[in-house]
């Protein structure tokens, strides 16, 4: 606990994504020893400039106590860079986080195969279904799935893992209790029962634009390989790929080939330039590793049940009708499926939709549910192949 106080103090003074935390672990027996040495010792270390030393001298140690108290209140765990529990794969990069804040239980990432599944927030339905399906199958093979908790590909990969009863790690670019992407709050809560939501930023830290590139180095470091599902030419996913290759030039990069359009420019270019291996099946990823121990006794041939995702492409095959549109007589009585094991709110939303497009505001009016509660339900229903977004924020039965 003492080391935790000093490492939190260090991050409040120096910041995040710095090489200096790791360098201190080699120079001193403990961070406490460094702190107690005072300004003269900080200068002698040769690591800090005058501005940084001035900042350290002004930041009181008890600033850490408030953050630790918040962690205790919310039952968050913490792991310091010099703790035995700190992942070796994360320590091995140049700029590992001084502190990890954890909701849930961080799996033994060093001894378990892990794959990061990443892609655009504005994913197509093909990208959403593919990320869900690949994460589901990899999880069934015992692979830990790592992603960033964002909308689109990230969210779908986490949901696919949860559907497979697998283990997933969600790495955030803000404090883990910050109300960021409220529509994904339930997903993040569910992850903590089968994995962990983690961040290098203390609780209550607001997301900043530069946090997400910093966050990406953690995703890549924790992963044995990176799977890019759908990425444009300027996608943040490419930052994660570059980070992975800077950390380890032999890191395995995979990509799912997509249509020749701007949404897949980045993914396709990775394949074309031989930066990434093209995959069509989760086994392509498993087979690429010669010396990785996959901890599983699960049936890797198991497919997602029809009740869960009856139109999701199995083993990477695209849907028969990639646009997903079917022809219906709009005067036809909606044929809602039965026995879908939906929650009451999910049923309410599902039965508010028919073959003619229904706007989300109308769904809210019919169900008496706020839009922010409807959005994650809509995502679930889309992933299960029950509905489709056809225009704007309007939805119809499939």
Residue ranges and their predicted role:
Residues 3, 80-398:
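Glycine-biased, small-residue-rich flexible motifs in mid-sequence functional cores and linkers
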